[in-house]
């Protein structure tokens, strides 16, 4: 984990056509090649690239920003210039007795960042442990888990705006965060995030461990250390344990994490479903809405471990789609499995499921679901 920000500028490196293979650059391990790939080590390299963009036939193709590849579904052929932000560094920008402000470059691995902050005694991100991907992609989805969302700790985002070719510092309000949503997600290929600012607290007694099995597992960690209450580190380790038990490692079994969003439905619809399915899992939301566990819906529809080969749901977590033929399966096969699952769930519960990972079209533009809650 680096501790100082990169500042030296070197020319961005462009890969030639015959090596622009992105099959190993997406955690779903879908077969994909791109016209060219540009690796960005610092912000100056992007400025340099954009100064040439559009002025030469080599730079006349659409742009597509690819971070860690953990939340995307890539096409077999991507007819675009792929920009890969790989800026590295973590820097403390301000610190008091109660909090610390840090600035993290986009290329830092997210889980490594969580481990680093907890080890330093900086808290707030521990519930987001073991989420795959890089820090620069985290604001796009407003990643969340176990009662915490990224926006809870985020102060600002430094991002390049392609239409105006200018840099912007966006506050959390400017980012227009929602459930797994942000301005960056709604305006795809418009922004490239280079760094993210967080405010973390230093109170080791302040934890959020009431979600699911976290409290029980975290309390077990605390008791082993003769503590009466779990610390943020206990919560982090508990969540790591739980996620490792429920979610497959993409390096062992390719996947892109939770494939379907938990749908949000009206309270009266949820109450009606409860009469037929008393065990249905739901969580209260504002405005008399209920967030329903998509994994439960898929499992109750008889699809745990089901799908259309080689894309099937995971045996331990129906919310996750896995790829049984790494680097060979294509986006079209994912589409077939997704359609089968969403149609089956809708026929049984009349609840539409929305895909969480980003669907990338052949020209680098973003595709959207027909089912939206």
From Swiss-Prot:
Its main location: cytoplasm. Residues 30-203 form the FAD-binding PCMH-type domain. GO terms for molecular function: FAD binding; UDP-N-acetylmuramate dehydrogenase activity. The active site is at residues 180, 258, 356. The keyword S-adenosyl-L-methionine does not apply. It catalyses: UDP-N-acetyl-alpha-D-muramate + NADP(+) = UDP-N-acetyl-3-O-(1-carboxyvinyl)-alpha-D-glucosamine + NADPH + H(+). The keyword Cell cycle applies. Pfam families: FAD_binding_4, MurB_C. Its EC number is 1.3.1.98. Pathway: Cell wall biogenesis; peptidoglycan biosynthesis. Keywords: Cell cycle, Cell division, Cell shape, Cell wall biogenesis/degradation, Cytoplasm, FAD, Flavoprotein, NADP, Oxidoreductase, Peptidoglycan synthesis. It is an enzyme of class 1 (oxidoreductase). One of its GO terms (biological process) is cell wall organization. Its cofactor is FAD. GO terms for cellular component: cytosol. InterPro entries: FAD-bd_PCMH, FAD-bd_PCMH-like_sf, FAD-bd_PCMH_sub1, FAD-bd_PCMH_sub2, MurB, MurB_C, MurB_C_sf, Oxid_FAD_bind_N. It is found in: Cytoplasm. Cell wall formation. Belongs to the MurB family. This is UDP-N-acetylenolpyruvoylglucosamine reductase. It comes from Psychrobacter arcticus (strain DSM 17307 / VKM B-2377 / 273-4). The lineage of its organism: Bacteria, Pseudomonadati, Pseudomonadota, Gammaproteobacteria, Moraxellales. The gene is murB.
């Amino acid at each position: 984990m680096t501790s100082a920000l990169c500042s030296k500028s070197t020319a961005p490196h462009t890969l030639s056509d015959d090596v622009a293979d992105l099959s190993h650059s997406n955690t779903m391990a879908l077969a994909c090649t791109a016209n060219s790939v540009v690796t960005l080590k610092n912000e100056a390299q992007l400025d340099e690239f954009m100064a040439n963009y559009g002025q030469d036939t080599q730079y006349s193709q659409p742009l597509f920003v690819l971070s860690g590849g953990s939340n995307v579904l890539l096409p077999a052929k991507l007819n675009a210039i792929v920009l890969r932000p790989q800026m590295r560094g973590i820097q403390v920008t301000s610190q008091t007795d109660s909090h610390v402000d840090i600035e993290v470059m986009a290329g830092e691995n997210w889980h490594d960042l969580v481990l680093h902050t907890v080890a330093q005694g900086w808290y707030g991100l521990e519930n987001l442990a073991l989420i795959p991907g890089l820090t620069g992609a985290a604001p796009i989805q407003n990643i969340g888990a176990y009662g915490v969302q990224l926006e809870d700790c985020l102060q600002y985002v430094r991002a390049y705006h392609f239409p105006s070719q200018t840099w912007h510092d966006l506050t959390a309000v400017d980012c227009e965060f929602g459930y797994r949503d942000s301005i960056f997600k709604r305006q795809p290929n418009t922004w490239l995030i280079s760094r993210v600012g967080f405010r973390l607290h230093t109170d080791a007694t302040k934890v959020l461990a009431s979600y699911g099995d976290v409290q029980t597992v975290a309390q077990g960690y605390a008791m082993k250390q003769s503590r009466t209450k779990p610390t943020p580190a206990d919560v982090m380790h508990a969540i790591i344990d739980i996620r490792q038990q429920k979610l497959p490692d993409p390096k062992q079994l390719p996947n892109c994490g939770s494939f379907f969003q938990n749908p949000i439905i009206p309270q009266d619809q949820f109450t009606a479903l409860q009469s037929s399915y008393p065990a249905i899992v739901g969580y209260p939301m504002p405005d008399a809405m209920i967030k329903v566990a998509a994994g439960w819906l898929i499992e109750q529809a008889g699809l745990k471990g089901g799908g259309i080969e080689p894309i099937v749901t995971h045996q331990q977590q129906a919310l996750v789609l896995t790829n049984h033929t790494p680097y060979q399966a294509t986006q079209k096969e994912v589409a077939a499995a997704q359609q089968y699952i969403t149609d089956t769930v809708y026929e049984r519960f009349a609840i539409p499921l929305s895909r969480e990972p980003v669907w990338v079209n052949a020209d680098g533009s973003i595709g959207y679901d027909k089912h939206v809650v």
